[in-house]
């Protein structure tokens, strides 16, 4: 694979991981300060591409000090154990709720297979990481990397173990702000089966108040942050409104997605361009929102 390294600024570099040759899906970031950090690892299947991207930055694997996922879904940290095996000096920073899962992977892997089906096998099975090499990052945890610190902002909603990492005036947002399609100049929500809409909106509001310069999306690439969180909140709320209306009309998830295709410019185009890993992403988001609505209704 011919990985192309991109320079965002003197400290932040990034590349398209291209798992199973799928481009514009996963961005990997390298923060090169006095300490060197790898933000996200991608899935196990793209380990060789990850190594190539690191070396393209003029780094050796021993140069990596920290491996920092936003959360442990397979597309973000499924390759964590694999890269930790060869980055012998690195420690991984994870949410306290993810700590046990990455050291004892059975429930993590089984849950991933139950939710993702064959896609989990495409991503590949994670490897466990020794607890001695894990750092549990509570809310507000800070780590000095040199010129700047990196700070943990817990942003649940997409996942209970989701962290947005703040570096200087920028943020690595993972999936907390949805999916960014630069060619469409549009972002859309992304929600797994156990989505918490209330927490997702709270997380977006937390980020909205921090006045970032740039947002670094895992899906996909850097984006200037001006007005983005307000737009993101509005987009999440609009989707939820349409999903609720669809449920009231007794529509299926596919029928609700068709409504969204009609109402959201660029959504159908983005769906058609999705590769093998993302084929049902927007449908999954509708179903994640439907699941949240049903759980909320059951509480009443």
Give the predicted meaning of each segment.
Residues 11, 31, 40, 71, ...:
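Divalent metal-coordination and catalytic microenvironments
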Residues 77-87, 104-105:
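Metal-dependent catalytic neighborhoods of phosphoester/phosphodiester hydrolases
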Residues 2-57, 165-175:
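Conserved beta-strand hairpin/beta-sheet module of binuclear metal-dependent hydrolase folds
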Residues 245-300:
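C-terminal regulatory/interaction regions
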């Amino acid at each position: 694979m011919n990985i192309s390294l991109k320079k965002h600024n003197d400290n932040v570099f990034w590349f398209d991981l291209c798992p199973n040759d799928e481009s514009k899906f996963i961005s990997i970031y390298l923060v090169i300060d006095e300490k060197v950090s790898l933000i996200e690892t991608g899935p196990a299947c793209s380990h060789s591409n990850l190594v190539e991207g690191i070396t393209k930055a003029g780094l050796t694997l021993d140069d990596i000090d920290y491996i920092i996922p936003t959360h442990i879904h397979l597309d973000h940290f499924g390759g964590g154990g694999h890269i930790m095996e060869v980055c012998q000096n690195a420690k991984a920073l994870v949410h306290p709720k993810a700590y046990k899962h990455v050291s004892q992977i059975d429930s993590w892997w089984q849950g991933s297979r139950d939710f993702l089906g064959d896609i989990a096998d495409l991503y590949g099975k994670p490897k466990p990481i020794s607890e001695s090499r894990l750092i549990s990052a509570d809310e507000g945890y800070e780590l000095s990397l040199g010129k700047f610190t990196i700070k943990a902002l817990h942003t649940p909603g997409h996942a209970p173990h989701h962290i947005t990492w703040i570096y200087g005036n920028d943020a690595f947002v993972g999936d907390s702000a949805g999916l960014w399609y630069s060619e469409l100049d549009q972002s859309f929500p992304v929600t797994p089966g156990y989505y918490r809409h209330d927490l997702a909106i709270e997380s977006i509001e937390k980020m909205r108040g921090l006045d970032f310069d740039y947002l670094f999306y895992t899906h996909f690439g850097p984006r200037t942050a001006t007005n983005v969180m307000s737009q993101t909140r509005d987009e999440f709320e609009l989707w939820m409104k349409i999903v609720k209306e669809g449920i009231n009309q007794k529509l299926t998830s596919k029928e609700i997605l068709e409504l969204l295709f009609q109402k959201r410019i660029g959504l159908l185009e983005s769906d058609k361009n999705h590769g093998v890993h993302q084929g049902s992403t927007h449908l999954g988001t509708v179903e994640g929102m439907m699941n949240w609505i049903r759980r909320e209704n059951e509480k009443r």
